[in-house]
């Protein structure tokens, strides 16, 4: 019923008062076969009945049919207003227009029930805050890799060395074969 799972560390990275927790994660469920109630405890992942926290973003709470992984009865999100606001905040941050950048990210945070980011924040810290906010807001929506590539922060966020070539994509071989003026990226 859910092929997306979260690590306990990511689940616990949300602020306790963040309203997105209840719409992002399945934290409890009732087994339709025996009526038993299960509650997720990120501090007790050894519990075999509910050891992993599943993402709830693509689940229909009224759908109790067992389906194959990836077969969801609700629509996937392509773009959301929060994405527009956070992209705008990121652009303003890169122009060092901190006040303008804070407007968008703080709207997203307010909707999630969180306090605004203070206006005294540095550009570097705001850049990190925007990426973290995008991570929480778009969990399991496929944005993180592109965000980390764009901000060139894969090594920092993943906690390990990342070869520079992974910040770009190679050109398809058949395209470079067809066009001699098209040169492959030097790292590939």
Q: Residue ranges of each PLM-predicted region?
A:
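Acidic/polar loop patches that form or flank catalytic/metal-binding clefts of enzymes
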Residues: 21-22, 100, 116-119
């Amino acid at each position: 019923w859910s092929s997306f799972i979260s690590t306990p560390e990511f689940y616990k990275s949300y602020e306790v008062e963040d309203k997105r927790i209840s719409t992002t994660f399945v934290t409890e469920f009732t087994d339709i076969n025996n009526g038993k109630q299960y509650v997720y405890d990120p501090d007790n992942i050894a519990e075999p009945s509910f050891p992993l926290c599943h993402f709830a973003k693509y689940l229909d709470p009224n759908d109790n049919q067992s389906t194959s992984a990836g077969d969801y009865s609700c629509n996937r999100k392509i773009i959301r207003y929060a994405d527009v606001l956070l992209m705008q905040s990121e652009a303003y941050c890169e122009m060092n227009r901190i006040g303008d950048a804070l407007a968008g990210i703080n709207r997203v945070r307010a909707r999630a029930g969180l306090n605004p980011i203070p206006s005294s924040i540095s550009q570097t810290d705001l850049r990190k805050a925007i990426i973290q906010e995008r991570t929480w807001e778009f969990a399991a929506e496929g944005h993180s890799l592109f965000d980390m590539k764009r901000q060139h922060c894969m090594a920092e966020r993943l906690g390990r060395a990342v070869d520079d070539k992974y910040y770009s994509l190679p050109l398809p071989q058949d395209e470079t074969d067809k066009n001699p003026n098209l040169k492959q990226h030097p790292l590939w």
